[in-house]
């Protein structure tokens, strides 16, 4: 009898934990703004070309990872984007959205694997190219699920930004 009670209590405890694990700690907008976007910016910002004015003169710069630490940061950003794509497929984020939500999130997982591979190979051209594909995946999702559309789980103020920022 004692074993049955212990087993029953353990089963109930595990079931209760399972439900809590599916509930995200952030709205999708918060998750995007606080986690996904900054991580994507790290990847996108790793390889780029800039033309700026310095003392009225144009200065052109190729921005690219130079050290092993730089490349590790790019690779880590790519890996995190893949993890975030997986997270977006969890019921707490996917519930109430269409099947295309799952496809977009899975596309983020897949393109992030390519991004991670490009960074691991320290291939500047490939990092730049795959960055465009990451952008396309993000844009396709945002075209269907606009950030300010009142997606289930959004709260007023989730997307407010500082006008001076």
Residue ranges, per PLM feature:
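Bacterial N-terminal signal peptides that target proteins for export
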Residues: 1-8
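C-terminal motif of bacterial Sec signal peptides marking the signal peptidase cleavage site
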Residues: 14-16
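Sequence context surrounding c-type heme c attachment/ligation sites in exported
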Residues: 18-165
């Amino acid at each position: 009898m004692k074993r049955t009670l212990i087993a029953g209590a353990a089963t109930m405890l595990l079931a209760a934990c399972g439900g809590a694990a599916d509930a995200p700690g952030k709205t999708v907008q918060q998750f995007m703004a606080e986690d996904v976007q900054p991580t994507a910016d790290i990847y996108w910002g790793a390889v780029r070309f800039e033309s700026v004015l310095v003392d009225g003169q144009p200065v052109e710069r190729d921005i690219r990872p130079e050290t092993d630490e730089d490349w590790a940061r790019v690779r880590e950003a790519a890996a995190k984007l893949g993890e975030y794509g997986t997270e977006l497929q969890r019921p707490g984020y996917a519930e109430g959205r269409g099947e295309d939500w799952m496809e977009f999130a899975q596309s983020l997982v897949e393109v992030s694997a390519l991004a991670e591979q490009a960074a691991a190979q320290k291939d500047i051209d490939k990092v730049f190219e795959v960055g465009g594909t990451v952008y396309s995946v993000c844009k396709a999702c945002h075209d269907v699920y606009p950030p300010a559309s009142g997606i289930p789980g959004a709260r007023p103020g989730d997307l407010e930004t500082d006008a001076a920022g």
